[in-house]
């Protein structure tokens, strides 16, 4: 008996999908405006391909309340329905794990968090590779919102 796509684990992007903003921009605004001496380090890491490093640096310092973020309410209602019927839902984001875990805890329906860390920026093909490694090609659904999600959608059984 074949598995229905709606029964597969659903990986959900955070920035622009679950929330209507981007946590990197929020982190930059909340941290760098208050600590501008960190700007050269962020610029250097960005220019040398170490985006995950500056996300981690800002994630360690960032103080925010996940309840104050603007969530995609219609999508969140749909996710709540999927969760209540037993679907496994994973937060899969390029945001840093420190930040993503706070959002996931606030939302309260994610069974796991896959996120960037100090060394690995979980975006685009890297996110696709991580999801395929965990669930197999075509073994998951994916909800995203940008051109960075195309590589993930290509490997997913369900595209949202």
Where are these regions (language model features)?
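C-terminal cap/substrate-recognition subdomain and adjoining C-terminal extension
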Residues: 1-7, 64-160
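Active-site neighborhood of HAD-like aspartate-dependent phosphohydrolases
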Residues: 2-59
């Amino acid at each position: 008996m074949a598995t229905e796509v709606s029964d597969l684990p659903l990986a959900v992007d955070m920035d622009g999908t679950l929330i209507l903003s981007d946590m990197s921009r929020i982190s930059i605004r909340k941290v760098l405006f208050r600590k501008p001496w960190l700007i050269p380090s962020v610029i250097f890491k960005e220019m040398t391909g170490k985006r995950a490093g500056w996300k981690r640096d800002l994630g360690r310092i960032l103080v925010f309340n996940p309840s104050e973020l603007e969530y995609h309410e219609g999508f969140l209602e749909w996710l709540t329905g999927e969760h209540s019927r037993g679907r496994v839902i994973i937060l899969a984001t390029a945001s840093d794990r420190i930040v993503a875990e706070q959002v996931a805890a606030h939302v309260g329906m994610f069974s796991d968090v896959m996120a960037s860390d100090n060394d690995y920026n979980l975006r685009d093909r890297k996110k696709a590779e991580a999801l395929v490694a965990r669930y197999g090609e075509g073994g998951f659904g994916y909800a995203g919102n940008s051109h960075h999600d195309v590589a993930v959608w290509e490997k997913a059984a369900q595209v949202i």
